[in-house]
Every structure is written in structure tokens, then in C-alpha cells.
């Protein structure tokens, strides 16, 4: 059976932040739903939890802002995209976004970015560097605040050909379902936090 989608996510380091856990969760969701799911990262705490049967993990120095390494990563990504027949490249950070932009231009694959925060831009050079996050064909803002921030500060890089939308961060409601926690676990947690059960 052929995969429905072939998605490559690129993230500097797979730690415990919002962008990182979002990447991790999406990678496993895709892998569990008959899609080819790949992550390119330099490493991080979450790497050891990746289910290698569901998600293909490739390590590259994508955390680096060094222009030579950005170019090296772009060339490596071209080979990864072609070898795995990737259809969508999704990135959540600026330095690897430049590598992904180059790689998707060469391979003509769909390029998606998620704008998670308000990047510092004290001068036009920094603003240009940040602008890579709005140079994709689909731009995702993590909140209404970020959506307004991007429209206000990067409007010259936006055009009608680009889709720009808000996708709010979600949680797995099955995992956080209160009925899955035993009364003894709940009591222990309340005790650990110094909370009174009668006041909840």
C-alpha cells in the first residue's frame, strides 16, 4: 500500500517546547495514519521517545545559523526529499527554514512554515532573516496574536498567493482524560502539590 502523504518536518532540536512537542505529536499521528513521516533534527530530549517504526529520524546540524551549514543542510535536504519522495516540508524555525526554502525551490515541493513566536528585529537585516518564515506557500500562526503580529510586521512578504491561517495548539483529550487517573494517583498528586481535595 502506498502512503497517503509524505511529510518531512524540520526542527533545530527536539526538546520539550511547544514547537518541538507539536512536531513530535504530528509526526506520530502521521505515522500511525499510513503516511510517511520524517523528522530532521540535530537531536534533543524527545529523540529517544520516537517510535522508529512509525517515524523516520534523520540527524543534521539544522540548529546552526552558520551560512555554510545552512547551505550544507539545504543540499542534504534535497537528497532526503528526493530519496523519500517527500511531498510536504514543514519547518518551525528560521535557520532551518532557509535550508528548507532552498531545498523546496530546487525540488519543487510544498513548503509550510509555522510562526510560533515574535522574533526580535532591531534592524532590517534581522527582519529579512526572520522573513523566511513567511516565504512559504502556507504559513501557520500559532495564535491570533501571532497572526496579527505577522500581518503588522511582515506584510510586504505576504501576498494573495500565500495561504496564512491560525491553527491553535491542541491536546490529546484521551491522554488527559480525568477518568484514566485512579483515585490514589489523584490523591498522591494533590498531596505532592499541597492542595486540599475538598477545595477543588
Segments (PLM) and residue ranges:
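A short, active-site helix/loop in glycosyltransferases that binds the activated sugar's phosphate group
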Residues: 136-166, 171-178
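A short helix/loop element that forms part of the nucleotide-sugar donor recognition site in Leloir-type
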Residues: 154-155, 177-195
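Short beta-strand scaffold positions
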Residues: 40-42, 90-91, 141-142
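A conserved, positively charged/aromatic
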Residues: 105, 111-142, 148, 158
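Conserved donor-binding/catalytic core segment of Leloir-type glycosyltransferases
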Residues: 8, 196-200
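Short His-centered aromatic/hydrophobic patch
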Residues: 91-97, 115
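N-terminal strand-loop element at the rim of the active site
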Residues: 5, 9-17, 21-68, 156-163
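Alpha-helix capping/helix-boundary segments
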Residues: 45-46, 95-96, 145-147
Amino acid at each position: 500500500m502506498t502512503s497517503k502523504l509524505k511529510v518531512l518536518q524540520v526542527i533545530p532540536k527536539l526538546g520539550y517546547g511547544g514547537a518541538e512537542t507539536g512536531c513530535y505529536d504530528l509526526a506520530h499521528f502521521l505515522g500511525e495514519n499510513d503516511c510517511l513521516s520524517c523528522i530532521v533534527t540535530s537531536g534533543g530530549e524527545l529523540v529517544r521517545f520516537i517510535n522508529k517504526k512509525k517515524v523516520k529520524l534523520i540527524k543534521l546540524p539544522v540548529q546552526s545559523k552558520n551560512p555554510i551549514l545552512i547551505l550544507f543542510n539545504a543540499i542534504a535536504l534535497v537528497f532526503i526529499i528526493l530519496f523519500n519522495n517527500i511531498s510536504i516540508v514543514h519547518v518551525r524555525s528560521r535557520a532551518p527554514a532557509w535550508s528548507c526554502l532552498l531545498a523546496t525551490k530546487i525540488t519543487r515541493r510544498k513548503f509550510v512554515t509555522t510562526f510560533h513566536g515574535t522574533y526580535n528585529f532591531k534592524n532590517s537585516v534581522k527582519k529579512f532573516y526572520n522573513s523566511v518564515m513567511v516565504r512559504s506557500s502556507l504559513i501557520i500562526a500559532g495564535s491570533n496574536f501571532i497572526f496579527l503580529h505577522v500581518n503588522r510586521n511582515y506584510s510586504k512578504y505576504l501576498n494573495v498567493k500565500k495561504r496564512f491561517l491560525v491553527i491553535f495548539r491542541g491536546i490529546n483529550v484521551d491522554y488527559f482524560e480525568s477518568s484514566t487517573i485512579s483515585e490514589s494517583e489523584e490523591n498522591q498528586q494533590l498531596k505532592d502539590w499541597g492542595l486540599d481535595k475538598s477545595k477543588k
